[in-house]
Each structure stands twice: as C-alpha cells, then as structure tokens.
Amino acid sequence: MATVMKKVDAVIVGFGWVGAIMAKELTEAGLNVVALERGPMRDTYPDGSYPQVIDELTYNIRRKLFQDLSKSTVTIRHNSSQTAVPYRQLAAFLPGTGVGGAGLHWSGVHFRVDPIELRMRSHYEERYGKNFIPKDMTIQDFGVTYDELEPFFDKAEKVFGTSGTAWTIKEQKVAQKGGNRFAPDRSDDFPLPAQKNTYSAQLFEKAALEVGYHPYNLPSANTSDSYTNPYGAQMGPCNFCGFCSGYAC
C-alpha cells in the first residue's frame, strides 16, 4: 500500500542546481516544499574535499557523478527521417546524478546568453532568408529578451561567485585588459575579479594579440578569492588543481 505523506505546497522533482534554487526561493516565499532526488546525497564535505577529489579512476573512468545511461537516457537524431536512438556514451553532454546534479561537476564556464541567442530563428531568417532553416528544425525564438533576463543573470553571478572582467556596465565602457568587447551590456560588475591567467593562457593571449584578435578573461564560476554569496554560502578560492569538469568541486 502506498504511503500517504503530509500535504505540501510544492514538490520539486530532481534536486540539482535548478531544483535547489527553486526550493530555496519558494521556501523563502513562505511555501512548504519537498524535493525528490533519485540519486545519492552529496555535500561539500566529504564529496568535494581536497585532495581526495582528484581521483581519476573514480571520477574520470568510473564516472561517479554522472547518470548511468544504461538505466536512463535521452534519445538523439539529426533529422526527422532518422530513427531516434538512445544516448549511450558520455561526451560533451554530462548529465549529473544526486543532490547538486551537474552543478557538482561543472567546470564553471559562465558566459551569459547573448541577445542574439534568445531570438535565434528571427536572427537567421533576417540574415539568410525564410528558407534558410529546414522545415523539420525546431529552432525557435525564446519568449523573453536579454534585457528582461539581465537582472537574473546578475543575481545568478552573485550566487555562483562568478569571477570575470566587465567590458561595459550600464552602457558605459569600463574596459580593462581582459574584458570581452563582444559581451552584452551588464547592470553591475562581476562579484569577483577574473582568475589569474596560467602560463599557457598568457602565451595564448600574447599570440592572439599579435595577430589582431581580442582575447579576454573567461567568466568563471570558480571564485578567484574567498567569497560569501547572497545565500550565505561560503566559498573558498579556486586552487588551480586542474581537476574541473567531471570532478566534485
């Protein structure tokens, strides 16, 4: 017989980053919330403790933090004439499992969505004509604009402790070395300065500048200094261990 639980205001299925943030926002708004997560409980300690976390066998080979694709996966096809087949080999798309989801093993690359990406269909039709996009391609414009989302991008960067270098703030150029001149305008600076460049990054920057390109510091949700976010979570600075994507950090 099924167990009848106490009624709540909201049930969140999946307690990754999105689910966790939704639960916090709803709880602070006064709702009684329950979150359901099929994966294991994970926490900063011991799951993300250093140096235990730099274990290539556990994380890179045995894929501890990723979903078991033999049990649950998505299907993929390249066009409507093909038969969709299950995604069975992890590549660039790395779905996480357990509390924290993919946020636990995310490398921290933290670009904002470009305004063009939010109106992708219109952009390409304006540029290349109505017949450019195949009929069976589902590409669509989003129902919101960059300006509508910008305050939430700003809040997210403050929650994640994003490190970076701004190019413009409120349409005023604040260009410093390392700023991205191609980035959309922002209402506030990054909460933390950009990460220090490694030696290889310095060599790349030098070579790119010499041939006329515009290299910039990568926005990174790995804190460049000690940081306490608006939720009260304390974060230590990145220690440049190099074990990023796929490892608990």
Where are these regions (language model features)?
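N-terminal glycine-rich phosphate/pyrophosphate-binding loop and immediately adjacent elements
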Residues: 2-132, 138-155
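Conserved redox-cofactor binding core of oxidoreductases
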Residues: 60-61, 68-73, 85-92, 117, ...
